Amino acid sequence: MSLTNEQIIEAIGQKTVLEIVELIKAMEETFGVTAAAAVAAGPAVAAAAAEEQTEFNVVLTEAGDKKVNVIKAVRELTGLGLKEAKEKVDGAPQVIAEGVSKEAAEDAKKKLEEAGAKVELK
């Protein structure tokens, strides 16, 4: 005789919580599975995406005390004129380089930090 889903649910509904826990353990052993709750894949997917990132934005977050040196570094990295570079530095946070490789982004970050700026890679 085969039980229907309704009959199984009705039988489980008549059991105590302790009996249901024992039933779950027995089913795990019998079928070689675990009854762990499914975990949302959001954080894992985000972490994988962060590892696969190939393009970076270099963001000047703060000019620091050595503003003149930072302006020179921005000019060197971007090819901007003095006025445009000063406007970028004065308007921090500003994107200095967009869609560059990891190596280029790290080099730009290093140059800007050596000049006295605070920089983030995004």
Curated annotation (Swiss-Prot):
Gene3D superfamilies in the cross-refs: 3.30.1390.10, Single helix bin
Key words of the record: Ribonucleoprotein, Ribosomal protein
GO MF: mRNA binding; structural constituent of ribosome
GO terms for cellular component: cytosolic large ribosomal subunit
A GO biological-process term: translation
Top-rank taxon: Bacteria
UniProt similarity note: Belongs to the bacterial ribosomal protein bL12 family.
PANTHER family for the chain: 39S RIBOSOMAL PROTEIN L12, LARGE RIBOSOMAL SUBUNIT PROTEIN BL12M
Protein role: Forms part of the ribosomal stalk which helps the ribosome interact with GTP-bound translation factors. Is thus essential for accurate translation.
Subunit field text: Homodimer. Part of the ribosomal stalk of the 50S ribosomal subunit. Forms a multimeric L10(L12)X complex, where L10 forms an elongated spine to which 2 to 4 L12 dimers bind in a sequential fashion. Binds GTP-bound translation factors.
Protein name: Large ribosomal subunit protein bL12
Native source species: Pseudomonas entomophila (strain L48)
